[in-house]
Design a protein with these regions (language model features):
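Bacterial N-terminal signal peptides
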Residues: 2-14
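Primarily short, surface-exposed interaction patches in extracytoplasmic proteins
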Residues: 142-177, 181-222, 236-275, 280-287, ...
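Solvent-exposed helix-loop boundary motif
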Residues: 14-109, 113-156, 172-177, 187-195, ...
């Protein structure tokens, strides 16, 4: 095994005093080590530039010398960290704090002397994310703006960068913002007015009114649908297996519903982690009434993508997907990079990787179907019955499958007997159905995993499963193991892995989760790379705040609803989105959170909002998708399963595939179901505008909305005012009402030329106006 790389950086020894040494050691070296060495030191050198010695900086890289002692303005190093050149910004994407830039400028001005201490040792294990969580109290805000701990952390960074927060948002903006955030739907006019009155009343306590709204939304069943969908992005949820023919998984909806119910019930996150990795094992240890949901939870692993055309073909790639998603979802680590060799950046070895590989190789994954399913008359396999005592049922099922062939053979011998032929056809149909189902027809099952034969994996040389290297006993990554984890001889070790991940002192699990929640509330995480907390990921913008949230999250029982309450109570969340006082110029990406970031509704929220405003949203939970009967399955790689099932249910219930993305979700930046989606892109492209103008779905919602408007009142002014309230969360002003009435009248005038008249003409005109409201920025964006 290669030893974990510890990069020893040979430093030039210059003539310098102890004061210069102290300055370099305190202010320059730590920044080079933490920020620069991962790309410009050790085994990794970008653009031929090294920063591990004074000589290397004097020599420079592709762009020339990086350091000109005594001349800061001629030093490319300083130009890069000042972000003064569009093509030369280091570190990329985020500027170092102003005081750090000044430290480098002063250091260069004073001659850029280098430490005489000889050597600097940089150990990747010292990376910030691998250190224990430190819940340090925030400093007091001298301005008096911050009284919540979150706000004090934010105020400190704003002050550091010479920035001030904007004013609080308007009450109507706030309730629309938090309602979309927590349940993914627009507030009703009644909900808006109730909150506005309570918030704006002179004698009222605004935060009490705010807290009441937050509690109402967290108690809504719609909350789990919204936040379950966020987690479905992370776990690469799909209703198909991903093989070449993309076979459907009719049982997969149970895992979707598990996630929705878990968020609604505020199931502690450490428990959710354990159930998703080892729910089948926990099910046999706990209460019978929890058996089914815990088994279903392992859909997280069962969802690992299948490949090729045969059952369990390229299973090593399926296991790789399980390892990679586990690492990304719970630890924010790119474990896949250690499949062929020790990780080039993070201290993860091949032995760590194949130690995890052995855990999942000791696990039995279900087979949903593939191209050979029909051609070779294969059964679905290893689906798990959702009954605690299913052994007798399964034994009877297997016995029945054994009995059927002799009975069929006997019937085949009785030619010419019509009654026997009918019975033969029935027996053949029964055998085909039972064989294909993989479970008795009347027994509910889950697409879940279960323990298999225990395997101690061997290293795959260059990642090739046909070239086996030394043994790699099951284990967790050694560099953050802490107290040794003991794996059982008679089990996969998934439960031990899950328990290790949820230790209160684990350095990654809580940090990664609170960062995901923060990202959904603010549009960007404190760590901008939620699936990569390693050395190649972005450092946190507010490291102390991240640790504070992680520590308090664990202290409050891993409660995600507690975390929502805590974040939403902050002034930072309640800021307006319009930048003032040069804030946009100084902090264009809102990294320091002096304002709220305006955001486009994501695909699901946009579709659901249209359905809600039109009055056609079906809030019932739909259950399984209407897949074809299993007897008809026979898809191939040249004719894969492809289907779209229209519905008026919430978008979380749309059937999603791996080979063919749902066209609407693809257009509006829905998640990639083949891999963990850490953060969705947000595009604004002409095709989206064309969809909103022409798609039948939008037209249907606009017409239904128009019918609601027409039913309200015969007066056009009242109709316009109400339509704005329900669509945009605010009443129309006098100018908007006048323009709206004029638009409808002119539209009706034009329609009369087409011989359209009466009720149809009225509906068409108001449908057009309704579409304007549903496609306007004020509907599509949240401030």
């Amino acid at each position: 095994m290669q030893a974990i790389a510890v990069w020893t950086l040979a430093l030039a020894i210059g003539q310098t005093g102890s004061a210069d040494d102290a300055y370099f050691e305190a202010k320059i070296r730590p920044v080079l080590v933490e920020t620069c060495f991962k790309c410009h030191g050790g085994t990794k050198v970008s653009n031929q530039l090294r920063v591990d010695s004074r000589e290397a900086l004097l020599k420079g890289g592709k762009n020339g010398p990086a350091l000109v002692p005594g001349q800061p303005d001629k030093s490319l190093l300083l130009k890069a960290i000042r972000h003064a050149d569009e093509e030369l910004k280091m570190p990329p994407g985020q500027k170092l704090p102003a005081h750090v830039v000044k430290d480098f400028a002063d250091w260069i001005q004073q001659g850029a002397t280098w430490s005489t201490s000889g050597k600097i040792h940089f150990n990747p294990r010292q990376h910030w994310a691998f250190q224990p969580v430190k819940n340090a109290p925030p400093a007091e805000d001298p301005s008096g703006w911050a009284n919540h701990p979150i706000d004090r952390y934010i105020a400190a960074r704003l002050c550091e960068h010479g920035l001030k927060p904007v004013e609080p948002a308007d009450s109507r903006i706030l309730i629309r913002r938090v309602t979309f955030d927590l349940i993914g739907l627009p507030p009703t006019p009644a909900e808006v007015e109730e909150f506005v009155i309570a918030w704006d009343a002179a004698s009222a306590k605004p935060q009490a009114a705010w807290g009441k709204v937050v509690e109402r939304l967290l108690a809504s069943p719609r909350y789990g649908e919204r936040w379950g969908r966020h987690w479905m992005d992370v776990v690469r949820y799909a209703d198909t297996a991903g093989d070449n023919a993309d076979y459907p998984i009719p049982e997969m909806y149970r895992y979707r519903d598990y996630l929705i119910d878990a968020f609604n019930a505020d199931k502690p996150f450490d428990q959710m982690v354990q159930e998703q990795l080892a729910g089948d094992l926990l099910a046999r240890q706990g209460q019978p009434d929890k058996f089914a949901e815990r088994v279903v939870a392992t859909g997280f692993l069962a969802l690992s993508r299948r490949y090729a055309t045969a059952p369990y073909e390229f299973m090593h790639l399926t296991l790789e997907d399980a390892i990679d998603t586990t690492g990304a979802a719970f630890m924010g680590l790119t474990l896949r990079c250690a499949r062929c060799h020790d990780h080039k950046f993070d201290p993860i070895t091949r032995e760590d990787y194949y130690g995890l590989y052995g855990i999942f190789a000791s696990t039995t994954f279900p087979y949903a179907g593939s191209e050979e399913f029909a051609s070779m008359k294969l059964p679905r396999q290893h689906f798990v019955p959702l009954a605690p005592n299913a052994q007798k049922i399964m034994a009877d099922y297997r016995q029945r499958l054994k009995e059927l062939p002799p009975q069929i053979k006997k019937m085949e011998a009785e030619k010419g007997n019509k009654q026997a032929q009918e019975k033969l056809n029935a027996l053949r149909a029964e055998e085909r159905l039972l064989h294909r189902l993989g479970l008795p027809a009347d027994v509910p099952g889950a697409y879940a995993v279960q323990d298999g034969t225990v395997v101690e994996a061997r290293v795959h040389l260059q990642g090739d499963p046909d070239k086996l290297g030394p043994p790699a006993p099951r284990r967790v990554p050694k560099f953050i193991e802490g107290k040794p984890v003991v794996f059982p001889a008679d089990g996969s070790g998934r439960l031990q892995l899950a328990q290790w991940l949820t230790r209160p002192d684990h350095p990654l699990t809580a940090r990664v989760l609170v960062n995901r929640v923060w990202q959904q509330h603010f549009g960007q995480g404190l760590v901008a790379t939620p699936n990569n907390f390693g050395l190649r990921g972005e450092p946190p913008s507010h490291a102390e705040l991240l640790d504070h949230l992680a520590g308090e999250f664990v202290r409050h029982g891993w409660s995600i609803k507690w975390l929502h309450r805590y974040i939403l109570q902050s002034k930072t969340y309640q800021l307006a989105s319009n930048p003032t006082g040069g804030l946009l110029a100084k902090d264009p990406n809102n990294r320091w959170l002096g304002r709220f970031s305006r955001r486009r509704l994501d695909a699901e929220a946009l579709r659901d909002a249209m359905l809600a405003v039109s009055g056609r949203l079906d809030l019932k939970r739909p259950g399984p998708h209407p897949f074809p009967p299993i007897q008809a399955w026979g898809w191939t790689q040249h004719n894969p399963f492809k289907e779209i099932y229209p519905s008026n249910h919430r978008s979380v219930y749309l059937m999603t595939q791996r080979i063919q993305r749902h066209p609407y979700l693809a257009l509006f930046d829905g998640p990639d179901t083949n891999t963990s989606t850490e953060k969705r892109t947000t595009s604004l492209v002409p095709l989206q505008a064309l969809y909103l103008m022409n798609d039948p779905f939008v037209r249907e919602q606009a017409e239904a909305f128009a019918k609601r408007i027409l039913a309200l009142s015969p007066e056009s002014e009242r109709r316009i005012a109400w339509a704005h309230e329900i669509a945009w969360g605010r009443p129309a002003d006098k100018v908007e009402i006048a323009k709206g009435v004029d638009y409808v009248n002119r539209y009706k005038h034009e329609l009369k030329r087409t011989a359209e008249s009466g009720e149809r003409l009225e509906l068409s005109a108001w449908t057009s106006y309704a579409r304007v409201l549903l496609t306007a920025n004020e509907f599509v964006f949240v401030d």
